């Protein structure tokens, strides 16, 4: 029923599991988790070297919703969403004379808005990988697109020609492939819009929530993060109520898309765990994360990833301060699919990532 966006500090567990199993986060760990609820999700995909986690995580959520609604299991095309988003973002960037964030990042509402405007297609129909590379790598594409729109905005002429739009679309066609107007899937013919209708998924049925004190609670506001280029609104609630909404949704078979911060010391993809220990200074960090947070990043070593530890009690004030001073951001989107508890009774959230494992 609810699609939820947030940037809360949560204890997170990165392994899918079946109820009643005792599981752990990695070999040799003393953590023992019991599954409370685990919602059906599609297979993990890899965003590769791209900044498109927002598309992968939101579509994963939508795929789970389609299954929950009885529409069957479908792998949807993340790059079809990306392709359409990049087109609309370029149009807006030029109209704003370059005074807009232009990059590969995005927000969950980008996905629902693109589905409403353009529809969606299965992954097999549009891979967004015309050269069949082993993994996506948009390093070159991102620079080419930015160079094009900047050249248009900064052109030393009195008026713009309409030629930049087809030129820009040609670049997207080259790097991601031409968009299908019609296609065959499971023995039937579809357009992107008719296929979307067949899934019985209505983007209007979902809401976005957040928890910040610089806006009134129980009202909508435009979340001030660079990737919110559409300037869409979220519904603001107190942090404790936000967590209650999350737990209620998960316990009633509704998963959620989660805008998270994976630059925190306690986030360790390699250890399959994310938490907020009392003393984060004891976490030894080697290397660094890439700018798009599209892989496991820096190596982190600490006993907190090996056995249950004492964690900070996060308050509304702590959360707000971290957001205000840029310590906590929305740098990575993931899909929360369940709840587990460790041997001490502490709660964690099962999270599906888009880093290929």
Go through the PLM ranges and name each one.
Residues 21-313, 320-357:
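Catalytic-core signature of thiol
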């Amino acid at each position: 029923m609810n699609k939820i966006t947030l940037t809360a500090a949560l204890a997170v567990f990165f392994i899918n599991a079946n109820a009643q199993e005792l599981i752990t986060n990695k070999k040799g760990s003393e953590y023992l988790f019991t599954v409370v609820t685990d919602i059906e999700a599609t297979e993990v995909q890899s965003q590769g070297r791209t900044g498109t986690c927002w598309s992968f995580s939101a579509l994963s959520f939508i795929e789970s919703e389609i299954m929950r609604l009885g529409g069957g299991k479908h792998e949807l095309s993340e790059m079809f969403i990306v392709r359409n988003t990049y087109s609309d973002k370029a149009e807006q960037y030029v109209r704003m004379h370059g005074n807009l964030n232009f990059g590969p990042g995005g927000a969950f509402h980008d996905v629902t808005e693109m589905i409403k405007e353009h529809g969606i297609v299965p992954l097999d129909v549009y891979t967004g990988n015309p050269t069949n590379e082993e993994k996506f790598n948009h390093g070159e594409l991102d620079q080419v697109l930015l160079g094009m729109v900047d050249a248009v905005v900064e052109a030393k002429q009195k008026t713009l020609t309409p030629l930049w739009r087809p030129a820009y679309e040609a670049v997207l066609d080259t790097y991601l492939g031409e968009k299908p107007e019609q296609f065959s899937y499971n023995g039937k013919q579809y357009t992107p819009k008719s296929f979307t209708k067949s899934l019985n998924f209505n983007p209007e049925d979902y809401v976005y929530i957040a928890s910040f004190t610089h806006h009134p609670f129980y009202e909508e506001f435009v979340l001030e993060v660079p990737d919110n280029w559409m300037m869409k609104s979220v519904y603001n609630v107190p942090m404790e109520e936000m967590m209650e909404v999350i737990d209620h949704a998960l316990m009633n078979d509704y998963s959620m898309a989660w805008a998270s911060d994976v630059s925190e010391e306690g986030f360790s993809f390699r250890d399959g765990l994310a938490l907020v220990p009392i003393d984060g200074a004891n976490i030894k960090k080697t290397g660094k994360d890439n700018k798009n947070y599209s892989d496991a990043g820096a190596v982190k070593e600490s006993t907190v990833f090996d056995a249950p530890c004492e964690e900070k009690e996060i308050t509304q004030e702590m959360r707000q301060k971290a957001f205000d001073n840029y310590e906590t951001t929305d740098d990575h989107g993931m899909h929360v699919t369940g709840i587990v508890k460790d041997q001490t009774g502490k709660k964690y959230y099962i999270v599906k990532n888009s880093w290929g494992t």
